Design a protein with these regions (language model features):
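A short beta-strand micro-motif
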Residues: 14, 18-24
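Non-Sec secretion/translocation targeting segments of pathogen effectors
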Residues: 125-131
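Acidic, low-complexity, intrinsically disordered interaction modules
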Residues: 22-34, 38-106, 110-111, 116-123
Length: 131
């Protein structure tokens, strides 16, 4: 795992709002999976940067509860209307071309899985040393 990937995973975890994004490309093909921070600004940056390249993006929390669903770059389903309003505050200027999407706190899902496996291994090694 590269140092910048490890750093990004730790930055996502420091937001205390991590979840998963599933990006479905136009014309089919394999979906792309990401772990990302679920802050309104980060969600807007992710959707604003990737939304028009994807037919659909589904974002869930770590318990697989729907946070937001997009269709062709537009918010479609957002169960928490307060969160939806906060996402729109950041997303609308991006969609209107008034500003570029900012930094996105996200890594591919396999990178996150590798990080957690590495973390589990370190915990196991520490426990073995205590014996």
């Amino acid at each position: 795992m590269r140092a910048e990937e490890k750093n990004m995973v730790e930055r996502i975890m420091n937001t205390e709002t991590m979840g998963y994004a599933y990006e479905y490309p136009y014309g089919g093909g394999a979906r792309k999976e990401y772990m990302l921070a679920l802050t309104p600004e980060n969600l807007a940056n992710f959707i604003g940067a990737r939304g028009y390249d994807a037919k659909k993006i589904v974002i869930t929390d770590v318990l697989d509860r729907l946070i937001v669903n997009t269709c062709m770059g537009m918010l479609d389903i957002c169960p928490d209307q307060k969160l939806c309003g906060r996402i729109i505050e950041y997303l609308a200027p991006i969609q209107l071309g008034e500003k570029e999407a900012g930094e996105i706190l996200a890594v591919e899902r396999n990178v996150a899985d590798e990080y957690f496996a590495m973390e589990d291994e370190e915990v196991t090694m520490a426990e073995c040393q205590m014996l």
